[in-house]
A protein has these predicted regions:
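A short, exposed loop/beta-hairpin motif centered on an aromatic-Gly-Thr core
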Residues: 26-37, 229-236
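Short aromatic-glycine-(Arg/Gly/Cys) micro-motifs in beta-strand/loop hairpins
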Residues: 5-27, 213-230
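Basic K/R-rich, polyanion-interacting modules in nucleoproteins and related proteins
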Residues: 1-14, 61-216
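An aromatic-rich alpha-helical recognition segment common to small helix-rich domains
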Residues: 19, 39-47, 222, 236
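J-domain (Hsp40/DnaJ) module recognition
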Residues: 31-85
Length: 236
């Protein structure tokens, strides 16, 4: 049996292989595989990620990683492809190595803290890598929360599953589900992926209240919805 690979049997009697690696005295689970070759390859990649920072890295300033580059390199290198899986198929190394695990391992290597969610720590902020093209920035005040909650994205809507409910990440700023970007809240620097507290500005904090500009002055319009919108009044 290859290093870091452990043969296990399921309740139905079928065999699978668990993969784990130890780094800085911490035992880290990589995943489970139905094929021993894939399990061995996953361990090899995890080992390389931890011990080859020049090849496997995160550029925190550019918000990029070497993931896509390495995946493409492996895909184009026939000697690095699997041709020995039980069913005869050929599998590229990075098609089965989780992107989130890639980020977690690099963060642990660079910052000494292992976080299960795809977070990379920066100075006074952290990056959350949903995928190679979608990276969010948060204030460190949110680190504990997102270390224990996985962010999901559907149609540009970012949310977490919190106690069985889909909760928008905007709710942490007091922004309601029906709020409209540009009217009820804005991103100060124009970056809609920057969720640091200093960048998210809540304009309308209350139900039925809209901030309006008239003749260079700011007013607040109050309205109620009863079979249509009715304006209650405009206030300074």
């Amino acid at each position: 049996m290859a290093t870091g690979v452990y043969k296990t049997t399921k309740k139905d009697g079928s065999v699978y292989y668990r993969v784990s690696i130890t780094y800085k005295n911490k035992h880290i689970s990589i995943g489970s595989y139905d094929d021993e070759f894939l399990a061995s390859a996953a361990y090899a990649i995890a080992n390389d990620v931890l011990y080859k920072p020049g090849t496997y890295y995160i550029d925190k300033d550019m918000h990029t990683t070497s993931y896509n580059h390495i995946a493409a390199e492996l895909s184009n290198n026939a000697s690095l492809k699997s041709s020995n899986i039980s069913d005869g198929t050929s599998v590229d190394f990075f098609t089965f190595f989780p992107y989130a695990k890639f980020i977690s391992l690099i963060n642990f290597r660079d910052n000494g803290i292992y976080i299960k969610t795809p977070i990379y720590l920066c100075d006074k902020s952290f990056l959350y890598f949903l995928n190679p093209e979608n990276i969010l920035t948060f204030s460190t005040d949110d680190l504990f929360y997102y270390s224990h909650h996985t962010i999901l994205c559907r149609g540009g809507y970012y949310f977490v599953n919190d106690y069985g409910m889909q909760t928008s990440i905007l709710s942490r700023f007091g922004i309601r589900n029906h709020s409209v970007k540009g009217r009820d809240y804005i991103f100060r620097n124009g970056d809609e992926h920057d969720y640091r507290y200093e960048n998210v500005c809540v304009i309308n904090k209350y139900n039925g209240v809209n901030k309006i500009e008239k003749n260079g002055r700011t007013f607040f319009q109050s309205r109620i919805h009863i079979n249509g919108n009715y304006i209650i009044g405009i206030y300074k």
